[in-house]
Design a protein with these regions (language model features):
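Substrate-access "cap/lid" subdomains that shape
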Residues: 43, 77, 86-205, 231-249
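Active-site rim elements
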Residues: 23-28, 89-94, 163-164, 225-238, ...
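Mobile gating loops/cap/lid regions near enzyme active sites that modulate substrate access
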Residues: 242-245, 249-312
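Serine-hydrolase-like catalytic core of hydrolytic proteins
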Residues: 1-115, 166-189
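Alpha/beta-hydrolase fold catalytic core
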Residues: 181, 209-243, 248-253, 258-264
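Active-site-adjacent bridging/hinge elements
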Residues: 6-13, 215-223, 283-286
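A structural signal for well-ordered alpha-helical segments within the folded catalytic domains
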Residues: 32-35, 39, 97-101, 173, ...
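Short, flexible, mixed-charge acidic loops at enzyme active sites
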Residues: 11-19, 193-195, 276-283
Length: 312
């Protein structure tokens, strides 16, 4: 089953710092929505033939990040038995100090003075909130690549600790976890959502504050850099693969954790540095090695790549 939860500025932007003595605004509203949905499943799923003690939560990309985050939400304890996080996105969790900054920017873009921000939020239409959200995202990405304002904030009753730190210290829900990514995660983002560093200019911006030796070590890890294929790989590693590896290593120290990688073959017309115009029609499954505390999925080999439907 799937659930609806509040998105963007309506649920994923922490505006709690704009609360007043008579208007209380909670943070992490979308996580609270998901906890309520899981509680509903616990209380009602048996009526539909389900087993409330055998619930698996899973998601892809932003959904994968939410899945991993729920592992660190105290109120979600006991509401699921295992989790699958497919291509979790990095850089979406923020401390309260940064959330306060984003909230102030949001109020300013909405045209509200700080002391009137809470009432302005109540008066604003959903369309105005969404439009302001898009402006905030664009502004944040211009100021610093990867500064994405939409996502969970840690430091409140809903999410007390950064999820990866909670996993690392054993404070998260220690249920079996599958986590992994796909080959060339950054390739799709070369055509839309220019928020991933998938070209040299964006990578230079990303690494602008890094020490020269650090920049050299990072780019040296991609022998073909700055060719497009290497930039795309670096962008995918930054946004998705690094997050999956961190989650796997942290969670794997305390609970069964399985790290996977899904590979595909590009069509015969795609050159090494080209971007496919349509999804490739050849694929295969594979596993990757990970941290020693992480087990690899025992997937059987699929043999030669074959055109047509993906084989598993």
């Amino acid at each position: 089953m799937s659930v609806n939860y509040r998105l963007g500025a309506l649920g994923c932007l922490d505006l709690s710092s704009l609360s007043t003595s008579d208007i209380t605004i909670d943070g992490n509203l979308y996580l609270r929505d998901l906890v309520l949905a899981l509680q509903w499943v616990r209380d009602n799923i048996a009526q539909f033939g389900g087993d409330p003690d055998n619930v698996t939560i899973f998601g892809e990309s932003a959904g994968a990040h939410i899945t991993a985050t729920l592992l660190a939400v105290p109120a979600a304890k006991g509401l699921f038995a295992r989790a699958i996080s497919e291509s979790p996105a990095a850089g979406m969790v923020r401390p309260r100090e940064l959330a306060v900054e984003f909230a102030a920017r949001f109020a300013d873009l909405l045209g509200a003075r700080p002391r009137d921000a809470a009432s302005a939020l109540i008066r604003a239409t959903p369309a105005q909130l969404v439009q302001t959200q898009h402006r905030l995202i664009e502004q944040g990405m211009q100021k610093r690549l990867g500064a994405f304002p939409i996502g969970p904030t840690f430091g409140d009753d809903c999410l007390p600790v950064d999820p990866v730190e909670a996993m690392r210290s054993g404070q998260s829900h220690q249920v079996p976890l599958i986590v992994g990514t796909n080959a060339e995660e950054g390739r799709l983002f070369t055509r839309f959502l220019k928020m991933l560093p998938t070209n040299k200019a964006m990578i230079d911006e990303l690494l602008a504050d890094a020490e020269p030796a650090t920049r050299e070590r990072i780019t040296a890890a991609y022998p073909d850099y700055p060719k497009p294929s290497a930039c795309i790989q670096l962008g995918g590693d930054f946004a998705f693969n690094a997050a999956a590896w961190q989650i796997a290593e942290a969670h794997g120290a305390h609970a069964p954790t399985y790290l996977y990688r899904y590979d595909y073959a590009r069509g015969p017309c795609a050159g090494p540095d080209s971007v496919p115009r349509t999804p490739p029609n050849c694929s295969r499954s594979s596993t990757s090695t990970g941290p020693r505390s992480v087990r690899c999925l025992p997937l059987p080999p699929t043999g030669d790549m074959r055109c047509g439907s993906a084989t598993t």
